[in-house]
Every structure is written in C-alpha cells, then in structure tokens.
Amino acid sequence: MNKNTLSTIDGAEISWFAPLCNGDDDFLGNRNPLYKSSWENTSSIVKTADQLGFKNVLCPSSYQVGQDPLSFVAGMSSQTEKINFLVAIRCGELHPPMLARTIASLDHMLKGRLTVNIISSNLPGTDLSSKERYARSREVIQILKQSWTQDQIRFKGKYYDFNLSSRPVKPYQQNGGPLLYFGGYSPDGVDLCAEFCDVYLMWPETKPKLRGLMDTMTNKAANYNRTVKFGLRVHVIVRETEQEAREYADQ
C-alpha cells in the first residue's frame, strides 16, 4: 500500500485548480458562457496539469452550480497517471459513513493519489453558526478516521451517533487515510485543523500576517503532539515580462 502522499513530496508541492464551479473565465467574477464549467474542458485542464508535472489539483465544491467533485475525481482516476487530487468535502452534506466509503473507494481507484479538503460552510436551507459548523466538521472528521482505521465506528456526539461496522471501508493509504487539507482563520477552525488536519491552507496576506498564522498553527498543533504543513492559494498571472504581467493585472 502507498505511504501518505505528503511524505513523497520533495520541497514545495506546486498544484493547480480544476474549474468545477463557475467556470474558467479570463477575469475573476466574470461569467462568460464560453468558459462555463464542463466535463470536456475541466478534464482537459486536469490531464494537461498531470502531463506538466503538477503535484496536486484542487477540485472545489459548490452547492449551487458546477460539477460534483467526487464524481469528477472518479471519472479522472483512469485518465491520469501521477497527479494527486484534492477533493473538496463540505461536512454535513453527505452521511459520514457513506462519505468514508466513497473516499476509500476513490483512494483505491487512484492508488493513493487522493487528498481531501475539509469545508465547513453552510448548506442551502440551513443556518448554523460558525461555531456549530466547525463542531459538526470535528465530528465528521472523527467518524471518517474511525471508518478508515478501525473495524467498528463507535461515536456519540451532538450531530451524529453511530455504532456500526466499518468493514471493509478502508482506503488504499493504510496510514490513517488521505491527507486532510483545511482553510479557515476563526479560532474554532484553527483549533480543528491543529488537532485533526495535515495541511493548513492560507490566502494571500502580508509576510508578517502569514508568519503569524503559521506560528499560531504550529503552536496549537504542538499542544496535540502534531505537526501541520502549510499551503498558500494564489492566482498567478504569467507573461513574458513583469511589466506585461502587471499591466494585465491592472485590467
């Protein structure tokens, strides 16, 4: 069985983005029908990223538009060779034991090339507070980990109460399951990541702000005898010269 995918990374993991939600537009916020998200366009992008040597590709989730990330990743499993898939999972959207089964099945299809992005946003028609959503995500993660590492799920919390067999819901990665990525700045989210997740995702900030976030996460993870890696999601504009890139960015 494959070892945890993070252990095989040399230096930084350079990843790409699959436009599963609103499409692949020229400018942020634009909704050009020509670039509407589709299987044909998005699968082509991912196959190109695989051929170019990118380490991972984020497959985001949307509950209003776009394609289903789990189905998309399943379809791409036989069409790619090396690239990992970072599939976004919105906690509470799927029944946790069945979600564990789906992720384990995907991990076998990909032979360990699967990572999971934990999302805690609200679902349409619900209105949970941030604290409640992170509490629910905490329960979902614990159930997933039990499903992947034990033969019986025994869990009782505020949102879920299970006592059922988890055989043979075991992922290809026999070291606790796929790596968990997480992004969020609230205290509850930071603590959740420190205790359970493997990679903390951040957005463009000043260097002092990023350093502060990393120091906070490192210290909190140490309280759980854990270490957490870090990721940064940015939009990159590439042109032949810096001047051309800056001019395009100003449009």
For every predicted segment, state its role:
Residues 2-35, 93-159, 204-218, 227-229, ...:
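Flexible, glycine-rich active-site loops centered on histidine and acidic residues
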Residues 7-9, 46-51, 73-82, 103-114, ...:
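Acidic (Asp/Glu)-rich catalytic clusters
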Residues 12-18, 57-59, 84-89, 114-118, ...:
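Hydrophobic faces of well-ordered beta-strands that scaffold small-molecule active sites
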Residues 41-45, 49, 102, 140, ...:
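Alpha-helical packing segments of well-folded alpha/beta enzyme cores
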